[in-house]
Amino acid sequence: MTLSFTARWRDELPATYTALLPTPLKNARLIWYNDKLAQQLAIPASLFDATNGAGVWGGETLLPGMSPVAQVYSGHQFGVWAGQLGDGRGILLGEQLLADGSTLDWHLKGAGLTPYSRMGDGRAVLRSTIRESLASEAMHYLGIPTTRALSIVASDTPVQRETQETGAMLMRLAQSHMRFGHFEHFYYRREPEKVQQLADFAIRHYWPQWQDVAEKYALWFEEVAARTGRLIAEWQTVGFAHGVMNTDNMSILGLTIDYGPFGFLDDYDPGFIGNHSDHQGRYRFDNQPSVALWNLQRLAQTLTPFIEIDALNRALDRYQDALLTHYGQRMRQKLGFFTEQKDDNALLNELFSLMAREGSDYTRTFRMLSHTEQQSASSPLRDTFIDRAAFDAWFDHYRARLRTEAVDDALRQQQMQRVNPAIVLRNWLAQRAIDAAEQGDMAELHRLHEVLRQPFTDRDDDYASRPPEWGKRLEVSCSS
């Protein structure tokens, strides 16, 4: 089957990019590809044949129909206007046309210098490409909207970061790479007609049902806000901290995008800061809902030339509603509740307080809770707490709450185990795969990808364990 590519972005938004070709790496070689995703997209196996070199995965060749561009956008970084940014090392190669008429961006990260590289070198390093590939696939299999990873190419090209590393490329796929920052770019350049063109593009291709509706722009922004609210709710329920929620890292489609200094909670710490460059804690775990709203407010400002203020405020309210509704639903599922009752939030907050005091492992606590038997007065979770009396008091309240619903253990446990993962991508697991890969051993990278495809399956090996001492509080930065 021949892959078909279109160039909608290039054809319809000429002011938003620079056309250019990728710059290949030295001795580039394909070290991993996403076989399941490749099969779903009907990508010929021959394209992954190592005897053909790095090929399209390393920017050495293009597939018919590809028209590479680097996109320009701007944004607020750490709450401060940063001006023009753009694809400083990534190139949108083309948009794959799928059987249902939708498209999928093929974006090559680490593809070399672009007009938007600023002081950068246009490269990505092996460490960061491995982290992004693992994170995006882990989030996908957790059921959270995200970009996808299709391939990783390693090389012998030296790249200087805090230390000297080697260059790599990641093929990232997404329904769209449209960001809040695209709109900010033209708003602050005082080109509102181009802001409106971006909105028209989004509606035409992703919300076509509203094209002929009078209030199409207000409806569109309301949906952007709602998607953002649902996304942040999903992050909070699995204990995911993005680490660098700048406006240029926010997706119009409500996707998790740009995995840098992210981290999943080990110990439950609502103030967890994954990014060691975030000295003020702006992007700490418990501040993510507020930051997302702030980012939406920045996007709303760019839309004021063609959306009424009242409509924008209604959309921002929709964000709050979507966030709280989705978060509440998901947390009730994690606790095994099938109905909503007035004391549910208090019961959850009591558990969180207990976990915070004890430094309980976030993922393991909820997974162990999902094995609770309603009639049993004891729980294996009890042994993980030092203050047994406090746990017993909470557990008595919890069991009493379970008894208010006519649901048997098997059905409740089944629901809980579908939403409480046994495995998340802990930073130490990613680091172990990176350390091996940097020595030329890709086995752990491949193994970890396989493990992350089944996050809701119990395991008795270290993939489901708490981190070892060396793996606690690993420092992660924006350097990539």
Curated annotation (Swiss-Prot):
Q: Which InterPro entries match?
A: adnlytase_SelO, SelO
Q: What is this protein called?
A: Protein nucleotidyltransferase YdiU
Q: Which cofactor does it need?
A: Mg(2+); Mn(2+)
A molecular-function term among this protein's GO annotations: magnesium ion binding
What organism is this sequence from? Salmonella newport (strain SL254)
For the ligand (Mg(2+)), the binding residues are 249, 258
The record's active-site residues are 248
What role does it play?
A: Nucleotidyltransferase involved in the post-translational modification of proteins. It can catalyze the addition of adenosine monophosphate (AMP) or uridine monophosphate (UMP) to a protein, resulting in modifications known as AMPylation and UMPylation.
